[in-house]
Amino acid sequence: MSRFIKGMDLSTLLELERCGAKYYDHGKERDILDIMRDYDVDTIRLRLWNDPYSETGEPYGAGCNDLAETIAIGKKVSDAGFGILLNFHYSDFWADPGKQIKPKAWKDFGVDELEQAVYDFTLENLTRIIEAGVNVTMIQVGNELSNGLLWPEGKVPNYDNIAKFVNAGIRACRKVNADIPIMIHLDNGGNNELYVRWFTNFIERGEEFEYIGLSYYPFWHGSLDQLEFNMNDIAKRFNKDL
């Protein structure tokens, strides 16, 4: 690995600002981005949801990270000198191992339509984000994909469909800018069996990517020794940076 990336997720930055949030460093009020820079943060993670509003137009909250909000935050932090890890969820709200709900607009789509929708959504939105001046330095295709994405069609163990959907996102990213590295991200970072099984199945079917991402919450995901073992094993086994 060429360098250590130190980052944090600021997807709720503007929503918190609108609510009057203030940030302090040793008791002194400061701009959050200045604080991050002084503590050597170099990358900001931003999520992108498809349509984070109810049928009546009420925002779901938690940052309401549609395209416009993501561009606004992305420009703000890019102008401050940070790189952006852009995280496509392919859902209208949180996508995680317990729920990978298809966007409302895609709810009746079959496999082929979902594959095309992932490609089109990724291509259009990534193009607009970069054209707006956001400094995208890495792209995460999906979020915590341990149990798949776009359920039920893309739910584990249906790795054929999982690969179709993730590959569509990767191809769209490469079409926009082939030099931006791609991350594939699971949860349960201490579970080596999960990572070996999932990535073995995906790599047999998948497009090339550069990084494996791991979520690790110690109260859920095992010991630090288990995390260390898993990271060392999958880095060597799959020849990927983490």
Residue map of PLM features:
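Boundary/entry segment of secreted carbohydrate-active catalytic domains
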Residues: 1-35
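Conserved, mostly hydrophobic/aromatic
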Residues: 8, 36, 87, 139, ...
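Active-site beta-loop-alpha junctions enriched in small/polar residues
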Residues: 10-13, 49-51, 89-93, 141-146, ...
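Aromatic-lined substrate-binding rim segments of carbohydrate-active enzymes
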Residues: 28-95, 103-104, 156-183, 228-237
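Glycine-enriched alpha-helix->loop->beta-strand junction motifs that scaffold or abut catalytic
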Residues: 40, 205-212, 238-241
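Hydrophobic residues within beta-strands of alpha/beta enzymes
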Residues: 44, 137-139, 212, 242
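Active-site cleft segment of glycoside hydrolase catalytic domains centered on the general acid/base Glu
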Residues: 65-69, 96-209, 221-233
